[in-house]
UniProtKB/Swiss-Prot annotation:
Binding site for ATP: 221-223, 231-236, 306-307, 365-368
Tagged with keyword Cytoplasm: yes
HAMAP family: Gly_tRNA_synth_B
Subunit structure: Homodimer.
Protein name: Glycine--tRNA ligase
Family assignment from sequence similarity: Belongs to the class-II aminoacyl-tRNA synthetase family.
Pfam families: HGTP_anticodon, tRNA-synt_2b
Length: 506
């Protein structure tokens, strides 16, 4: 049985050291989370699986790690300075602020229908309704009042202001003088660093079309209403690819990446049947998008929410950042750029003439991936003896701890010395973290490692060192290996243990 509430998952994450509230000892900071000892391991394993699949296992990909703070001109010409905003609305009764679409989505169906009726829109076309509310702010606030839109915090009908745009980028000052010439932004997405480094990568690697640039890194969005644990946060981490293709081949590559990404999620334990593919309606597309597929995972505690977007960005991005735009025959409509000093073109693979490539962008959030993987792995089981156990049935390559080595008696050197030697040998295999667990209570150790998803527990006992009562000589120099999922226990020779573990975890 999966987690039945977000609270259940949050409780496990804190109790077992996966995720903590940011700045918790000062009351916490909304939309910011810290990853604990096991959380950072799981997060790193997810990122490693993504990097291995998309960089190491392909011949057409390069990596990049661009800076977090960006020149304001980058985000001006990318369109973010003008368009990276959401309509917000305030309740004057309690000074609470909400994102317009989130507030409306939280209302009962009859309230939504009433708002739509007043605005002359259909409640079935939510995006068009939100667009109408944003376009007519005075009418929107009146519609909210007449329809009785309630404040999610107080539960009472609010006194709503006119909605107004709120730019979600974090602005910062660069250098010692704070003026209008010295500001920049924390990047709202990792993509722009890839586009501005396009020429550097091409020149240094001699890449030809098609090829991609992959990046994992932090991005920052000043969300109006961060919520649902790590699903919607203000500091996030992204795994993004910008895959550059010859114009005219973009639709074929779009389908290629859709299938590739669905397979990757399946390999991480997120079943394909739990992911709906949303072909984003034209009116909902981002300003740069020709077409976008959103992968909507059915979170057990949230319902269907976006886990990844796969966008056909056409030639918008490189076209926006390049000089000499008028000479390049761009398909996308871009603002004139007199600030860039680079011509972001590449030889066409057939004609050898300079061309601005189209871009296919698979973009996934590490935090949302964490939440999906944890949600899918979280299992409550009733054992044969009637006891209940919680177990994280993580894929072994994602498990924060691969193996726990447990001495049955922590005060007996004969046993602890063998356990420590086994731990050192297994750690040397390079499979991930191996933990020496000397809590002293084997039952509690098993339960703890079930909850954190450790695939195998290796127990060194008295039989291992020939000190057990009526010890069977065949048990000497063997250990008990317990399987997390089946609870089966098997005696394995110490001399064969490393190979046994390698075969199971690889």
């Amino acid at each position: 049985m999966p987690a039945t509430s977000m609270e259940e998952l949050v409780s496990l994450c804190k109790r077992r050291g996966f995720i903590f509230q940011g700045s918790e000892i000062y009351g916490g900071l909304q939309g910011f989370y810290d990853y604990g000892p096991l959380g950072v391991e799981l997060k790193n394993n997810i990122k490693a699986a993504w990097w291995r699949s998309n960089v190491y296992e392909r011949d057409d990909m390069e990596g990049l790690d661009a800076s977090i703070i960006m020149h304001r001109m980058v985000l001006r010409h990318s369109g973010h300075e003008a368009t990276f905003s959401d309509p917000m609305i305030d309740n004057k009764k309690n000074n609470k602020r909400y994102r317009l679409d989130h507030l409306l989505k939280d209302q009962k169906a009859d309230v939504q229908a009433k708002v739509a009726e007043i605005m002359g829109e259909s409640a079935d076309n939510f995006a068009a309704l939100v667009a109408a509310l944003n376009a007519k702010p005075a009418q929107a606030s009146a519609a909210f009042k007449e329809a009785g839109v309630r404040d999610p915090f107080s539960g009472e009908v609010g006194e709503w202001t006119d909605p107004k745009p709120f730019n979600m980028m974090f602005r910062t000052t660069i250098g010692p003088v704070a003026d209008e010439e010295s500001y920049g932004y924390l990047r709202p997405e990792t993509a722009q660093g890839i586009f501005t480094n396009f020429k550097n990568v091409v020149d240094s690697t001699s890449r030809r079309l098609p090829f991609g640039i992959a990046q994992i890194g932090k991005a920052f969005r000043n969300e109006i209403t961060p919520r649902n644990f790590i699903f919607r946060v203000r500091e996030l981490e992204q795994m993004e690819i910008e895959f550059f293709v010859t114009p005219g081949t973009d639709e074929e590559w779009h389908e290629h990446w859709l299938e590739k990404r669905l397979k990757w999620w399946e390999d991480q334990g997120v079943p394909r049947e739990k992911i709906e593919i949303l072909d984003v309606p034209k009116e909902d597309l981002a300003h740069y998008s020709k077409r976008t597929y959103d992968l909507m995972y059915d979170y057990p505690t949230l319902g269907h929410e976006e886990i990844e977007g796969i966008a056909n960005r056409s030639d918008y991005d490189l076209g926006s950042h390049t000089k000499s735009q008028s000479e390049l025959g761009l398909v996308a409509k871009v603002e004139e750029n007199n600030d860039s000093i680079a011509k972001l073109t590449i030889p066409h693979p057939e004609t050898n003439k300079p061309v601005v490539p189209f871009v296919i962008e698979p973009s996934a959030g590490v935090d949302r991936a964490m939440l999906a993987v944890l949600s899918e792995a979280f299992t409550k089981e009733t054992l044969e003896n009637g006891n209940e156990r919680i177990v994280l049935k993580l894929k072994p390559h994602l498990a924060p701890i691969k193996v726990a080595v447990i001495p049955l008696a922590r005060n007996r050197e004969e046993i602890t010395d063998v356990a420590k030697a086994i731990k050192a040998e297994l750690q040397g295999l390079g499979l991930g973290r191996v933990l020496y667990e000397d809590s002293g209570n084997i039952g509690k150790a098993y339960r703890r490692h079930d909850e954190v998803g450790t695939p195998y527990c290796v127990t060194v006992d008295f039989d291992t060192v020939g000190l057990g009562e009526n010890t069977d000589e065949s048990l000497k120099d063997t250990v008990t290996v317990r399987d997390r999922d089946t609870l089966a226990q098997e005696r394995v020779k110490i001399s064969e243990l490393a190979g046994w573990i390698q075969a199971k975890l690889r």
